[in-house]
Regions:
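A compositionally biased, intrinsically disordered/low-complexity signal enriched
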Residues: 19, 46-48, 55, 111, ...
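A structural signal for small-residue-enriched, beta-sheet-centric alpha/beta enzyme cores
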Residues: 2, 7-14, 34-43, 71-106, ...
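N-terminal structural module
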Residues: 10-31
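Short, structured secondary-structure boundary patches
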Residues: 53-59, 146-151
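Hydrophobic, ordered structural segments
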Residues: 48, 52-55, 63-80
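Polybasic, low-complexity intrinsically disordered tails and interdomain linkers
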Residues: 24, 36-38, 63
Length: 182
């Protein structure tokens, strides 16, 4: 299910510049900061949500203020509500049949890939980690029926490209205790 809102994602190589960009982004448009944090490698990530036009204006201001400290920026239109709900927190699934994990080289592509995965197949997004405490990398996990999980993982990888991926795993018939680990 899509949430009919957009997400703006900015990754900066400077924590101070990131905080300045966040302030400018929030002042420039009617957006809600979903994530704003320092991550490993001295980077700062910002994720804002709102109507597409507001997010576009906010992201433009963030890129302007961030200048050469901007490492990456993306917009996700009509973000899937499951990807947004699992952003930097674990969302328990009722039943776990299969588990899919995609680990990304950088933080923000994990969110972009998780959104694509959730839109491609009927899966539950269990978590989207955007770099906090994991060396600046990112990952997402999805659970569901094995075929759906395979489809979701493939769609997530396709959305960001193989070069952005560290690893992708599908565990069919996951053990019941795996639920506590994801």
């Amino acid at each position: 299910m899509q949430a009919n809102i957009a997400l703006g994602l900015v990754e900066l190589s400077s924590i101070a510049r990131g905080i300045e960009a966040l302030d400018a982004m929030c002042k420039a448009a009617g957006v809600k900061p979903e994530v704003h944090q320092a991550i490993s490698k001295g980077k700062y990530i910002i994720v804002v949500s709102g109507p597409l036009g507001e997010v576009e204006s906010s992201l433009a201001k963030g890129r302007e203020i961030g200048g050469n400290a901007v490492v990456a920026s993306h917009i996700i239109r009509n973000v899937h509500s499951g990807a947004l709900a699992a952003l930097n927190k674990k969302v328990k699934a009722d039943k776990i049949e299969a588990v899919g994990i995609v680990e990304t080289k950088e933080a923000l592509p994990a969110l972009f890939a998780a959104d694509a995965a959730a839109k491609a197949a009927f899966v539950h997004v269990a978590e989207v980690n955007t770099g906090k405490g994991i060396g600046g990398k990112g990952y997402f996990t999805v659970v569901g029926e094995p075929g759906a999980v395979r489809t979701a993982v493939s769609a997530g990888v396709k959305a960001i490209g193989e070069d952005a991926v560290v690893s992708r795993i599908v565990i069919p018939n996951a053990h019941e205790h795996l639920g506590a680990a994801i």
